[in-house]
Amino acid sequence: MSSNQDVPLPFTSSRPLPSRQPTTSRPGGTLKRNKTLTRPERHVAPAPLVAPPTQSFSPTSPLPQSDGFLNIDWWRLWAYATTFWAPPVLLRWFGIKEKQSRQAWREKIALCWIAVLLGGVVGFVTMGLQRALCPADQQNQSMYQRLGDTNMTLSISGWAFNISTSITQSNVDFYSLANQMPGQDITDLFTRSVSDYPACTSSLAYSSGAFCNSTSSSSGTSCVLSSMSQETFDSLQIQNTSLLEGYSWDQVAKLENYMVIDGYVLNMSPYLSFNPTAVEGDEVDSIIRHVLSNQTGSGKDATRLFFNRQVPQDAVGCMKARYVAGRIDKITPGCFVASFFLYVSLVVILAVVLARFAMACVFNWFLSEKLVKPVTEKELGRKGINPTIMPEGANVSVNNKLGTAPWAGGGGAAEGKGGGVGPGKKLVNGKKINPLSPLPSPSHSLPNAPLITLSQIGPELFTVCLVTCYSEGPSSIRGTLESIASTNYSDRRKLIWVVCDGMITGQGEKRSTPDVCVGMLDADGRFGNPVPMGYEAVGSGQKRENRAMVYAGHYVSRNGHRTPTIIVVKCGMPQEATEKKPGNRGKRDSQLILMNFFSRVTYNDRMTPLDFDLFRKIWTLMGVTPDYFEAVLMVDADTRIYPDSLKHLVNCMHHDNMIMGVCGETRIANKRQSWVTAIQVFEYFISHHHVKAFESVFGGVTCLPGCFSMYRIKARKDGDNDWVPILVKPEIVNEYSQSEVETLHQKNLLLLGEDRFLSTIMLRTFPRRKNIFLPQARCRTVAPDTFSVLLSQRRRWINSTVHNLMELVRVRDLCGTFCFSMQFVVFMDLVGTVVLPVAICLTFALIVNSIITPPKSFEEAIPLMLLAIVLGLPAILILITTRKVVYVAWMLVYLLALPIWNFVLPVYSFWHFDDFSWGETRRVEGEIRSKGHDDSTAVFNGTTIPLRRWEDWEKSRLRKLRREEKRRKEMERQFGAGFHGDPRLGGDLRGMGMGERPWARSEYDSDNGSLYSSEEDMWGGEVGGYNEHNPAFPPPPIALPPTDDPVSNINGETLGMDEMAAILDSGFDDDPQSQSTYPPLSHPRPHAHPPPPPISRTLANAPSPVRRHQHEYNAPQPRFNRIDSPSFGSGPNSARSSPHSADAGRYAAGEYVSIDRQDTNDLDAQMPHSGGSVSSSVESRPHGVGHAKKRSGGGAGIGAGTGARGGGYGPLGPLADVNEVGRGQTRGYGGSGKDR
């Protein structure tokens, strides 16, 4: 088969093409249309947030839009329109010289204008809408007295008077009038003059007629009572009730000669008495007579007729003053609209507030408790996809039927079987064996079947704990690592992954951050000194390329935990050596090192040298390949997690497969350090237990904080038959790794709030999956203790919140519908964030106004009720959820600081929309303040970093080892065993595996089918100068228990207890001086070997990362060191060369299984036969029931070559020195040495 095996073969058959299948599903069926509406290819993927979509022929890609009117950049035009008064010359004169900075400034002004407009709208709706639609003279319904409802009352000029104590007059009987109709109008009984009505200046009839109308005379000229003054009222003993006389529309319709203008009821009887006939040419008279004669059943409202023309409109004021009898006491349309809006606002806001409160309580009480329960045996008993099976869309050869990863078959790098890829072996006829065909695996320590029971993985998922460091000090970093290592989570299932963001020394620190981190590592000596490995970073211009060194070992906690640890130190390119912060690319780049690595592992995509180096070291440290990891915990370097937090988070992932991200509660560790930390305590609490708890009910937590959040790397599908990449999905990784950002919106998304932006991307990509909050998982972090640092931190948070909510509000697939949806809640959060300054000002105005003029009605009290509910419910939530009264005191402190939270911080943030720096948050020694507008003049012309798949990197690694071995043999033939740099004498090549015992030979060592011969492979320098399979070190740990597959037992026979005891007796030597640290010969597959705990040592004598960085670029190392050069090997000369003498009991107890040595022959000459010794493995059995299995055949002996330095390691512990037990014999792996 040709090397282009992934290319589909052309159709060359002479048979005709198959005919079309029948359209009916069964005989006699009917013709039906297929379910075209459910075709997944018709789903339109969301457009990227940052980079525009590229041209693609995928049916899921959005259709390209043609250039036209709709493609105009309206936002850029709006930015220029709002800043037309600031030409570029003026901005350059004020110091804004870069084009990007000027554009960012214009966009900032445009956003501030929008914030001001929204604030104005909110202010008008809150304070001005009521006054505009319902003036003060129309809005108070309690000022009215309805006509006919109150006895012993009459009205004068629209006001109700009490006549119960009045003196009876000879010409007017007040009591008789009140009995006829309580409240009727008696204004025309009083004497009035023109001076009483200054608005009546016209000569028309309505203004110049008589003022009086006698009840006993029809002449209309006599007035029975004196003028309307307080003296007259006192003499008549009638009292003004200060209530307006109210009329209903029905009453006005029934009353003769009454009509309405603009809500005023007018008694036109005096006018008609004085003008019994129509006045010729009088437009006002015509309207009056038309309304009174033609609208007898409709309330006689003349408002529209009077306001249509100028002359009648001028008469309105005079007519209201002269003929008023009362008011319409029904609510006016304006007041109705204002009241309706007020009540709708009350219902909506109250519903949202109460719903948030209720759902937060329900989640804290019930839902979260279910998520943290231990995983049951029933859940672990179901079948699931094997972690070594790659997801759909991965790079899988056409012959790989199961889709297994190339490193998964049979055990990994040393074999390349069972789905692995390698050069293959030639047959006699010259054809190659198909390297992807499933071959029998000699190892059964890991499950090989496509579907496995989840119990084989166990309740503890393989988890990466990512710690991103920048300029933190030793105490912060050690506290974080100590808290992770001390969690009640197995050290075999967690990997601490530390990323140091550049060669940086924090302000006030004596050592650089990389030096601090590496100094805490108990390094694994097999990896030697790391070399810088290239990778593609986040940056512009030449910053797109970067290099990093990978330190591997264990972090040893105070309570004895030995946790596998990887430290990635970003050291930068050679030209950065003289810069202030070489290698620094930001926190997002640190996260993307991990995300890109696991994405390439998941899809078998092309790897950078850094990825391959990480792959090898993780495999060696953990005993499993990286594709076994399913979750990643992201923690900041100043955060300390609680001991049970990691287990709670993983249990949450177990119970709900739809959860893609989960965060815990973050508490403040320095709450009493200053007033700045004190005002943050309640804010942290309420943002988690109120906001995030409510969002968790919908599964849509909009911000998973970067200081303490767990993401799912990949999830099993509902049918457990395939993987769904989550965090490492290419769409997420590509969008999160954008380097070229131009607009202010993009920079706020990517440069300030990378954690929130990652949550936004995941919710947009997987709107049906969940981001939740888990209150049982807790951590403590150090909050800003000075106001300047708090100001800088909240500026980043507020600005990133605004821009991320602007993107989330456009996601239509979030949970819920209309007002009962997560999208509506996001919209309210966005508006609420923008109008915070206006809201706090209106709040104080409301409080002051309520104190000066207390509310007199329910409607006036509604704003105060809302304010009390919004501020009071959190206190109730505290008592319900935590039952800690002390948080009520912290709430009072928070309320006192409301002007800071809602006015000072937002206003400062909005005005600094164009500042993309971290400000005062993390200062570096010698750092110069930058706003993030660095316009790099260098152009990224492509990367020099090689990208190759794992198979190709592995071939290059093995070829390099072969070249080094060939070179060593040649040197030995020329100069003898003691030549300069001989690795057996402590030379530099010990890190390459050139110890006393060479490594195992592998079928990867063949050059068949390779593009390069072993001497022409150009990638050796990118592999790394170490051999993780160095037999001078213990094999990797057993990460998974052996499976119960019966196939694994076909090569052995059961031994009795006596025979087992004899084997154990013959496998050890009681002389402690003869014990050695060398393992058996051959490279084991890392997950197929029983490990004693790895021999490790610190890098106390090694150069620091900073010095190492300078050393690598300024002084190249010679190929061979002096004979007396120090070595990183942990042999007998090491101070801790034999720490494993007590491990035999652990082997005997069944904690480790035997090392299978099939196909691991030495590259050197054949070793002497060891006789008939037996390799045995001890299974984990109850006490007294154990048995062992006798292995047939054996690999090469390990006796030869070990006599000079001592023994090696067998499956049951340290082997005795061959000088003690006989020349050429071994204890452990037996066999003739040629059976395999």
UniProtKB/Swiss-Prot annotation:
Listed name of the protein: Chitin synthase 1
Top-level class of the enzyme under EC nomenclature: transferase
Annotated localization: Cell membrane
Disrupted gene: phenotype observed: Abnormal capsular morphology: lower fiber density, decreases capsular diameter.
Protein EC: 2.4.1.16
Presence of keyword Isomerase: no
Membrane topology annotation: Multi-pass membrane protein
Domain of life where this protein originates: Eukaryota
Lineage: Eukaryota, Fungi, Dikarya, Basidiomycota, Agaricomycotina
Example of a GO cellular component annotation carried by this entry: cell septum
Keyword Nuclease tagged: no
Organism of origin: Cryptococcus neoformans var. grubii serotype A (strain H99 / ATCC 208821 / CBS 10515 / FGSC 9487)
Induction: Induced by the antifungal agent caspofungin.
Catalytic activity: [(1->4)-N-acetyl-beta-D-glucosaminyl](n) + UDP-N-acetyl-alpha-D-glucosamine = [(1->4)-N-acetyl-beta-D-glucosaminyl](n+1) + UDP + H(+)
Ranges of the Extracellular topological domain: 98-108, 356-823, 882-884
PANTHER family: CHITIN SYNTHASE, CHITIN SYNTHASE 7
Biased composition (Gly residues): 1193-1211, 1225-1236
InterPro entries: Chitin_synth, CHS4-like_dom, Cyt_B5-like_heme/steroid-bd, Nucleotide-diphossugar_trans
